[in-house]
Amino acid sequence: MKQQYKTKKPLIILTGPTAVGKTKLSIELAKAVNGQMISADSMQVYRHMDIGTAKIRPEEMQDIPHYLIDVLDPWESFDVVRFQTMAKEALEKIYTAGAIPIVVGGTGFYIQALLYNIDFDENDSETGYRSELQSFADRHGVEALHDRLRQVDEKSADMIHPNNIKRVIRALEFYHQTGTRISEHNETQRQKESPYRFVYFVLDDERERIYRRIDQRIDQMLD
């Protein structure tokens, strides 16, 4: 088992709340271990969305490659499945370059999906049923659609915000297709052994200090 672990490819995870200091630490870490970055942020992937996303500035990158930043236009869709695909492509480029990937960000669901290679079973979809759910939401509102999810999968309903209609529909769609709650499916996937030899760092700080840094960052963005 120990020998098998050693043969796995290395992966570093660096996460934590906004303004805790991930960017600065990630750069120093990359210099120390010959690392390259993969952003696990659901908004920094978009171009033209610098304000409010705390996106790293080009001068801060210090010539260290950063993947999944400024690669999509705002009207393009981005979800955990697309993140997983793009992040795996970035991983292969980093490993080929002889470097160590450092996944940085605050979207924990995305990180777990990559770390444990979660299968979201997105291949089959019933367009008719999806359209029916979308029409229901248009007529009755997102809260009513979310209530339908709660009736069949309370755990998913607790985890998914009513306004995240795409994920609500996907959860209902999955239950309709398989008779299994997507929360149960995902939990099973999370119990899989990771294909990576990873270390997982979660940064934290006093709340007041984080809030002060957030205020300072907003002021800088708006100057």
Predicted regions located by residue number:
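Phosphate/pyrophosphate-binding catalytic cores of soluble transferases and nucleic-acid-acting enzymes
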Residues: 1-223
